[in-house]
């Protein structure tokens, strides 16, 4: 299903033969739960919008997997960051509901194909829920061609349920099975808000066990804000090293760094989640 995109292409499961990558071309990756836009309250979107723009400007990501963004909110981000294109579909269909929008740096990356599916027993049914969760959950994935290297890879973006553990476990199994269908020569990044602690949850164990994915956090040569929690809840930042936002990957890669972005201005957070970043180079 084609969503809102800066570049509309035909969705297919065909993959071209992968050219060899060019060394020295690392990608800056980010996962960022935006917190849906609200027009009232101390954390309303008009107050947070310039901080989101600041984070994106300072971190200069090549790809950002966002969660919870609403259509007008995503358009604001695109306006504030003109170097970024984006692809997404509302989880309720069209522009309705929260998006798993993928932003990408247009001068660096070319989207080749993209699609969406829902985290349920009927993943092709738009807005479907079958695992006891009341919120609809989905995945948006994009195949990119790196203009700097000619290499193609996939970026998957998701948001697991915040209430039902069984829904998270089944989501991990479904996502793992879908990624396994991607030809082995194609590297894959899976990013998102998983609503579960890294290293201490069944969904993490499944994705990094049977799913065969690696965590950029543990693969990184260095880490910044290592003890920071990725969920701040618009309060003082916890320092327990609890990450519910992850960037996982499949393929041979060198991860130079990973970190939690703790930007806060005059007590105002950009979101109730801190962005998590990784700098990765395919080998």
Where are the regions that the model predicts?
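Solvent-exposed loop/turn segments at secondary-structure junctions
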Residues: 34-37, 69-73, 91-95, 108-109, ...
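Solvent-exposed, acidic/flexible segments
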Residues: 41-49, 67-71, 96, 135, ...
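Active-site beta-strand/loop signature of hydrolases that rely on acidic residues for catalysis
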Residues: 27-34, 52-77, 103, 142, ...
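Extracellular/periplasmic catalytic domains that process cell-envelope and extracellular macromolecules
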Residues: 21-24, 57-58, 79-81, 93-96, ...
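Structured beta-strand-rich core segments of catalytic domains in phosphoester-bond hydrolases
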Residues: 63-152, 156, 259-260
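Metal-dependent phosphoester-hydrolase catalytic domains
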Residues: 17, 143, 166, 170, ...
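Acidic/histidine-rich helix-loop elements
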Residues: 31-50, 118-134, 161
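N-terminal, active-site-proximal structural segment of metallo-dependent hydrolase catalytic domains
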Residues: 4-80, 91-98, 173, 283
């Amino acid at each position: 299903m084609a969503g809102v995109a800066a570049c509309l292409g035909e969705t297919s499961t065909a993959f071209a033969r992968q050219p060899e990558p060019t060394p020295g071309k690392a990608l800056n990756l980010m996962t960022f739960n935006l917190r849906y836009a609200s027009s009232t309250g101390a954390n309303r979107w008009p107050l947070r919008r310039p901080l989101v723009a600041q984070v994106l400007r300072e971190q200069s990501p090549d790809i950002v997997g966002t969660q919870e963004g609403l259509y007008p909110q995503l358009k604001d981000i695109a306006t504030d960051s003109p170097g970024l294109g984006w692809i997404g579909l509302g989880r309720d269909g069209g522009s309705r509901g929260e998006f798993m929008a993928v932003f990408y740096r247009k001068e660096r990356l070319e989207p080749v194909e993209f699609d969406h599916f829902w985290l349920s027993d009927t993943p092709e049914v738009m807005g479907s829920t079958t695992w006891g969760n009341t919120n609809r959950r989905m995945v948006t994935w994009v195949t990119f061609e790196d203009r700097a290297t000619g290499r193609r890879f996939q970026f998957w973006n998701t948001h697991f349920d915040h209430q039902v553990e069984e829904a998270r476990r089944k989501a991990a199994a479904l996502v793992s099975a879908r990624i396994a269908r991607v030809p082995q020569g194609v590297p894959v990044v899976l990013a998102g808000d998983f609503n579960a602690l890294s290293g201490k949850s069944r969904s993490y164990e499944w994705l990094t066990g049977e799913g065969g994915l690696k965590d950029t956090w543990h693969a990184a040569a260095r880490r910044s804000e290592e003890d920071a929690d990725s969920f701040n809840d618009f309060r003082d930042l916890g320092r327990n090293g609890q990450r519910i936002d992850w960037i996982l990957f499949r393929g041979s890669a060198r991860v130079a760094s990973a970190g939690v972005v703790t930007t806060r201005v005059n007590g105002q957070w950009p979101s109730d989640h801190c962005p998590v970043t990784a700098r990765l180079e395919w080998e």
